[in-house]
Amino acid sequence: MAGKSEFNIFKHVLVPEHRILSEEEKKALLEKYRITPAQLPQIKASDPAVKALGAKPGDIIEIKRKSPTAGVYYYYRVVVED
């Protein structure tokens, strides 16, 4: 094998933008909605997008999606172990 081919998952048209929230952003999000991380939807650490970001269990991922009716909306997931 000549070399490892790298594929950037975030360049695919069907994959929305993902990013890891900072500790300050995480705290603000949880306070704003008066929730705990356990109340957020989960995303596994083995998810290709999570791996590409280098996120670890406990991190909160912000996902930015485009919608024809709502414009842009954000949703959040907490990274959990497999």
Curated annotation (Swiss-Prot):
Signal peptide residues on this chain, from the entry's feature table: none
GO terms for cellular component: cytoplasm; DNA-directed RNA polymerase complex
BP GO annotations: transcription by RNA polymerase II; transcription elongation by RNA polymerase I; tRNA transcription by RNA polymerase III
Location of this chain's protein in the cell: Cytoplasm
Similarity remark: Belongs to the archaeal Rpo5/eukaryotic RPB5 RNA polymerase subunit family.
Biological function: DNA-dependent RNA polymerase (RNAP) catalyzes the transcription of DNA into RNA using the four ribonucleoside triphosphates as substrates.
Protein name: DNA-directed RNA polymerase subunit Rpo5
